[in-house]
Amino acid sequence: MLLLEAATRTGWIDRNQMVAPSEILAHVAAIIPSTHFVTDLTRTSVTILAAFALGVLGGVPLGVLLWRVRVIGRVLEPFIVTGYAMPTLLFYPILVAVLGLNAGPIVVIASTMALIPIALTTMVALGDVKPVLHKLARSVDASRRQQYFKVLFPAATPLIFPGIKLGFIYAVIGTIAMEFILASKGLGFRAGFMYRELYVADMWAYIAIVVVFSIAVNSALGLAERAIRRDML
């Protein structure tokens, strides 16, 4: 940070591209009390969390299905991987026609981006559970629910949760990118507006806010992972 501060202050880095970290912090402090910041933060937070929740609620069961029914897994996995590489922005006009010009299309696109890595890692994680654990569950006459929640998911959690964290990252990327290009409110929209209007310091301030938000939620997911593993064992 000190090197970046010195480089921007001395002109080694073009101030039209990057400003000093101290200046970014000053702009963050000025932005946070503003009324439009609360609106933008609320819109982006709700969109990200909705997309992430849909990604988890859809991705984990899909991953279980792909693992449990091997035929479906073999058939669908190539299409899911292909969809992972497909630019989902192409579907935005269709989603606007169906859902309207609101946050709905952004939530759908961001949740799809989050769902795919969660589903794939869930499938792989359950497939890596040691066979002896399956035998153990059957030997104690565990119900199907007990097998999943007392044996399989605790054993697979170390691999599932990295996929969930990756899904959150993709939910953030999808939301911010879509807001940057297409939305009329949100942190991504505001950063894009500042970029187009050449307010470089404000643009970096909004980027810094998004980074801090992402780190905070990712840290919360790490705490949740440890709590869930402790409760499920």
Can you say where each PLM-predicted feature lies in the sequence?
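Periplasmic/extracellular loop-to-transmembrane helix junction in inner-membrane transport proteins
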Residues: 10-53
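N-terminal signal-anchor transmembrane alpha helix
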Residues: 1-12
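Glycine-rich helix-loop "coupling/hinge" segments at transmembrane-helix boundaries
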Residues: 97-98, 173-210, 229-233
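Generic hydrophobic transmembrane alpha-helix motif, especially the helices
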Residues: 81-117, 124-125
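Transmembrane alpha-helices
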Residues: 108-112, 144-178, 205, 217, ...
